[in-house]
UniProtKB/Swiss-Prot annotation:
Segment forming the signal sequence: 1-22
Protein name per its UniProtKB record: Omega-hexatoxin-Hvn1b
Keyword list, A-Z: Calcium channel impairing toxin, Cleavage on pair of basic residues, Disulfide bond, Ion channel impairing toxin, Knottin, Secreted, Signal, Toxin, Voltage-gated calcium channel impairing toxin
Organism: Hadronyche venenata
Bridged cysteine pairs (disulfide): 51-65, 58-69, 64-83
Keyword match GTP-binding: no
Amino acid sequence: MNTATGVIALLVLATVIGCIEAEETRADLQGAFESYEGEAADKIFRRSPTCIPSGQPCPYNENCCSKSCTYKENENGNTVQRCD
């Protein structure tokens, strides 16, 4: 068996072992969030609104905390949109 075949065999073995361990872990997590009810459970899984702070690049105006985005020169001399 050459080196390449040995490496492939080890990768396959590691993948199989990882899948077995992941299956066992998933069973342990099945009831992890059952103690939370109603609004408390919604807060855990609700995505909090995030905004881009001023001075950071902004792809869309609605993602800026200030709700405004203008073209400004960056450190490389290129013009990019940044949150105000």
